[in-house]
């Protein structure tokens, strides 16, 4: 792979650059942490697309369209695995993403990793994986106030001269940007939120799950509910959804912010939680369970943190998720390399603090990035425990594909480092509706009406920021 790049003093911010193009991918962080908020990544053009459904792998590029129906999951692993390039320059190696695959893996990818789940029907047309093949990016370094403009030939095999021509075109984008005003929001009718499962049915489902738990079938399960409303954005769909993303970033800042608008359904997300990372040969997952608001003063903040760390119910749930994370990492790590590097520490964000742990291991070099993702997907946070049994019960009781919700959103870099957020607090927007999904953790003493209210509260906190 050839790489050409230039480093420029940032003439604009990511919002201004991204706003002037209809189709784009934006990956950034809205936290104030130095390690999590340093970079923003913006990409406009994809060389191709990789789409996995339950029965077929589709690979779409300018030169070919491939449809594989024989062992599509294995074909996907081989296809992604072949695009592996070493980054020799330390300056570029430090950046989160310079080229590779960006997109999402759905909750339902688990049906490929565990074929036993395919006996359970799951209605829906969502893709199990949808990746865009990215060769050109703008990476904003907010601490140095610089932009890395990067062009590669990871997929296209373009010549070095062609790469420099592409780089010049990317830099010329800055001169084409007009500092226009934000799109005027039209008068929209009052939102009528439509859940996919009515209240009585959902309460009955929670009762069924409780019965299973009380019989010893599982410890916890996380059912979900989809909420949607008609948005009436019309011809302003693209600028208004990006405006919505910016509003979400202001009102609900999170470590993982993402906006995908590349011609299909639009993803807008503000996730507080990492799903999986791979860096320098290490695979890492961060179980999060236990949340409390931030205090108004330092003293109150510390008192609230101590209250959270003394809540045995929260600690018990957190330990269970740590055990699930250890089991998931064990399947893909070198023997003896598993480490619990953080155990039940407090991580503070703008409005809340969480109990967070960290499990890492050395990645088995024989595995592809897709092996790593499929081994951990979905996390226990959004499925339950034991994980496979909980997922079986979810599909039995709610025979629908979850799609993006509770899957992973992010990237696989060309050097096979990767970083995916857990796809919660995520909206899927099509030409007519905004969709948001929310779940609740059902345990032996859950109150069904309270679990229903939890899904309503989570969905409302996301949908209330919409225009």
Regions found by a protein language model. Give the residues of each.
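Extended alpha-helical targeting/anchoring segments
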Residues: 1-467
């Amino acid at each position: 792979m050839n790489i050409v790049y230039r480093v420029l003093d940032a003439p604009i911010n990511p919002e201004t650059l991204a706003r002037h193009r209809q189709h784009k991918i934006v990956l950034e962080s809205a936290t104030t942490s130095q390690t999590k908020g340093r970079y923003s990544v913006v990409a406009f053009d994809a060389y191709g697309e990789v789409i996995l459904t339950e029965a077929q792998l589709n690979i779409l590029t300018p030169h070919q369209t491939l449809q594989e129906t024989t062992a599509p999951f294995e074909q996907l692993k081989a296809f992604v695995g072949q695009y592996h390039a070493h980054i020799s320059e330390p300056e570029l190696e430090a950046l989160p993403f310079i080229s590779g695959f960006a997109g999402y893996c759905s909750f339902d990818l688990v049906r490929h990793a565990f074929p036993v789940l395919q006996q359970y029907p799951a209605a829906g047309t969502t893709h199990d994986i949808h990746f865009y093949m990215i060769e050109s990016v703008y990476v904003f370094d907010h601490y140095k106030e610089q932009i890395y403009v990067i062009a590669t030939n990871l997929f296209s095999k373009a010549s070095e001269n062609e790469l420099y021509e592409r780089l010049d075109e990317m830099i010329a984008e800055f001169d084409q940007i007009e500092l226009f005003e934000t799109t005027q929001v039209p008068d929209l009718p009052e939102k009528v939120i439509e859940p996919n499962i009515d209240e009585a049915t959902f309460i009955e489902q929670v009762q069924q799950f409780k019965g299973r738990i009380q019989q010893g079938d599982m410890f916890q399960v996380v059912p979900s509910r989809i909420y949607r409303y008609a948005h009436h954005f019309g011809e302003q769909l693209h600028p208004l959804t990006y405006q919505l993303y910016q509003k979400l970033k202001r009102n609900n800042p999170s470590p993982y912010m993402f906006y995908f608008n590349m011609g299909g359904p639009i993803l807008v997300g503000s996730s507080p939680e990492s799903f999986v990372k791979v860096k320098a040969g290490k695979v890492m997952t961060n179980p999060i369970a236990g949340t409390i608001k931030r205090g108004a003063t330092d003293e109150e903040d510390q008192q609230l943190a101590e209250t959270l760390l003394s809540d045995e119910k929260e600690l018990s749930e957190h330990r269970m998720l740590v055990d699930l994370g250890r089991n998931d990492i064990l399947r893909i790590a070198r023997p003896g390399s598993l480490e619990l590097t953080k155990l039940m520490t407090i991580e503070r964000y703008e409005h809340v603090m969480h109990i967070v742990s960290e499990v890492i291991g050395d990645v088995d070099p024989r595995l592809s990035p897709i092996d790593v993702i499929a081994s951990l997907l979905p996390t226990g946070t959004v499925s339950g425990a034991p994980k496979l049994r909980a997922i079986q019960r979810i599909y039995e009781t709610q025979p629908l594909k979850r799609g993006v919700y509770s899957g992973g959103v992010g990237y696989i870099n060309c050097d096979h480092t990767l970083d995916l957020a857990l796809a919660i607090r995520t909206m899927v927007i099509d030409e007519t509706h905004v969709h948001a999904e929310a779940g609740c953790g059902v345990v032996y003493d859950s109150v069904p009406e309270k679990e229903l209210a939890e899904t309503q509260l989570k969905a409302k906190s996301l949908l209330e920021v919409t225009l």
